Amino acid sequence: MKLAEGTVVGLIAGYYDVETAAGIVRTRARGVFRQKKQKPAVGDRVEIKIDDQGMSYLVKILPRLNRIGRPAVANVSHILLVISAVEPDFSLELLDRFLTFFSWQKVKVTIYLSKTDLLKGDKLAKIKEDLAYYQKIGYPVFTDYHDVEVKIPQMIKEGQIWTLAGQSGAGKSTLLNHLKKDANQVTGAISASLNRGKHTTRKVELFKLGEGFLADTPGFSSIDLTPIKLNELCNYFVEFKRASSKCKFRGCQHLKEPGCEVKKLLEEGQIMQHRYDDYLAMRTEISEGRLPEYLK
């Protein structure tokens, strides 16, 4: 009988594939997890027990950093957020929703603008101009596929788990297929009637990339922000949080308070108007406890 630690890299039909120092072990979880209403997730660090006959059982889930998405990925270090230039159309509202959600989850984000080859001229230039603002406030931004192919593997450090996320049909699985040639994820066509992608990824797996792992998750076009506390929302807009230290009042919500540094920077054009408008819209959404109409 021996114990080994590893990372859950796949889940299929009740079996867990766990990467250990000795290689990948396919195992099942002990019934105690059902009793505790716990379920191991892809990305979990776990302990497995291997008996003298070579049978193995997952016996312990080690403490998690986080657990994101459905199906879930645990211990996510970084999000590679794929936003399309077209098909589906580029959306600052959707971009801000993703960034706010992952900021709330305390996960760093790198932005990749996909399908730039399908859009030319002034429209593409305007999108890149908008994204330059996000780069200025601290988000790494890629608009060229070849840069992503070369630099993302270099950015994934030892033991890190990066997760692809973004709107349906933005090209996450296509990107993964290029980054990891044996990924074999199914890529699907766009559902033109809804201007959304078909949900083509049906499971979550981790693939070795760089010194860590990359996961693909099912595409989704909406994020539920209603669990966020209203008075904390402003903390998840990174430039608002930085500016708030100069606000006159502690806990300033950047609405009509006097001496608000965020409103001052907004008037000076140093904070993007669209970001502030999205902040106000999210406040309304959270206070009313419902998704906006365009996401229903």
From Swiss-Prot:
Chief place where the protein resides: cytoplasm
Signal peptide positions on this chain: none
Record InterPro entries: G_CP_dom, NA-bd_OB-fold, P-loop_NTPase, Ribosome_biogen_GTPase_RsgA, RsgA_GTPase_dom, RsgA_N
Keywords: Cytoplasm, GTP-binding, Hydrolase, Metal-binding, Nucleotide-binding, Ribosome biogenesis, RNA-binding, rRNA-binding, Zinc
One Pfam family matching this protein: RsgA_N
EC number: 3.6.1.-
Cofactor(s) listed: Zn(2+)
Residues where Zn(2+) binds: 247, 252, 254, 260
Gene3D superfamilies hit by this protein: Nucleic acid-binding proteins, P-loop containing nucleotide triphosphate hydrolases, Probable gtpase engc, domain 3
Record's keyword annotation contains GTP-binding: yes
CC terms in the record's Gene Ontology section: cytoplasm
Lineage top rank: taxon: Bacteria
Keyword presence, Metal-binding: yes
Residues where GTP binds: 114-117, 166-174
Domain spans labelled CP-type G: 65-223
UniProt GO BP: ribosomal small subunit biogenesis
Cofactor note: Binds 1 zinc ion per subunit.
One GO MF term: rRNA binding
Function: One of several proteins that assist in the late maturation steps of the functional core of the 30S ribosomal subunit. Helps release RbfA from mature subunits. May play a role in the assembly of ribosomal proteins into the subunit. Circularly permuted GTPase that catalyzes slow GTP hydrolysis, GTPase activity is stimulated by the 30S ribosomal subunit.
NCBIfam families named among the record's database cross-references: ribosome small subunit-dependent GTPase A
Homology family: Belongs to the TRAFAC class YlqF/YawG GTPase family. RsgA subfamily.
Subunit structure: Monomer. Associates with 30S ribosomal subunit, binds 16S rRNA.
Protein name as it appears in the record: Small ribosomal subunit biogenesis GTPase RsgA
Gene name for this UniProt entry: rsgA
